[in-house]
Amino acid sequence: NVNIMLCDIDCDREVTLTENASGKEFVKAMEGWAAITNNIFVWDYGINFDNYLAPFPNFHILQDNIRLFKKNHATMHFSQIAGSRGGDFAELRAYLVSKLMWNPEANVDSLMQHFLHGYYGEAAPYLYQYIKVMEGALIGSGQRLWIYDSPVSHKYGMLKPQLIRRYNQLFD
């Protein structure tokens, strides 16, 4: 009759929970609880609370993290991914997380393409490129992605002037 609620609020988001120091502490706690209960509730975060509209390219980690939750007996999962005012691709993020909760083995790229085409129509290929370029820039920069982040912290990485020009080209 007891739920164990674990929150990964202090974890970075540019790589999966198993790939960063802050995430490893969370995983250790989750694995410890999973050894003694099958009743774990995970409260996960996927948006920048200080800057809701700032880019938050973490789509590439969603599946591995959700698989990890399932493997460790998370029977409940709350993914705080958008506020009442929306957020960076809030609808896409909600769609992907929801689909992955039902089927952690689903093809994320297919799900993303399906949603983008249905929601954005002819703009879908450009938005897909934008997402992929930004994810690559984040990973390549080596900078952390955090839920209380300033876009200024990414001015030499995913938001550097050359990439802003590239993003604008995709939107034109």
Predicted features along the sequence, with ranges:
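Active-site region of glycoside hydrolase catalytic domains
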Residues: N1-I4
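Catalytic domains of carbohydrate-active enzymes that cleave complex glycans
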Residues: H73, K99-D172
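Short, charged, surface-exposed secondary-structure boundary motifs
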Residues: R13-L17
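Structured mid-domain segments that build the active-site/substrate or prosthetic-cofactor binding neighborhood
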Residues: L6, D12, S22-A123, Q129
